Amino acid sequence: MVEVGDLKKGMVIMVNGEPHRVVDVSKHHMAMGRGIIRTKLKSVVTGFVKDVNFSSGERVEEANLSFRQAQFLYSDGAHYHFMALDDYEQYILSEEDLQDAKWYLIENLELSLVFLEDKPIGVQLPNVVTLKVVETEPSFKGDTVSGGGKPAVLETGLKINVPFFVETGEFIKVDTRTGEYVERA
């Protein structure tokens, strides 16, 4: 059992005996009394999305998930192909199953496939992946005075902010949990 205040985007919980993936979660505090945890849940079975509100302090059952080491092979547009490393069996996930994880998938990336009752429902990425910068503005002398960074497009299409010294063609490390620049690779 997990407290609803600890729910995070991507977790899979059981609601009314059916597994649901947490698509969005927000906490709202009332002036007097307990807070409300508003969630957007997507049914793993049917794909329907519904809004569910929980009282602060409520507990929900976490789905019984299993994990297998796998490798990302390729994408054919709408589907993403993976291979289990232990028996070389291949699995296909849709873009909808992957959600934001699709922005970090490069060929041969090793990750964990997430299974619910022997059916793949998603992936668990490594905390940091190395991606190539394919487009960013050139740096100019004096850029660092204002601090901050500049926008960049990575090889997967992901758009993030990077420090001014990062140039097109360089490889950088990106945190898959936050989507932020970590360091040069």
Curated annotation (Swiss-Prot):
Q: Where in the cell is it found?
A: Cytoplasm
Q: Which spans of this chain does the record mark as coiled coil? A: none
SMART domains documented for this protein: EFP (SM01185), Elong-fact-P_C (SM00841)
The record's PROSITE patterns line, in alphabetical order, gives: EFP
Q: Does the keyword Cytoplasm apply?
A: yes
Xref: Pfam families: EFP, EFP_N, Elong-fact-P_C
Matching SUPFAM superfamilies, A to Z? Nucleic acid-binding proteins, Translation proteins SH3-like domain
Q: What Gene Ontology molecular-function terms does this entry list?
A: translation elongation factor activity
Q: Which family does it belong to?
A: Belongs to the elongation factor P family.
Note the HAMAP family from the entry: EF_P
Protein name (record):
Elongation factor P
Which source organism does the UniProt entry give?
Pseudothermotoga lettingae (strain ATCC BAA-301 / DSM 14385 / NBRC 107922 / TMO) (Thermotoga lettingae)
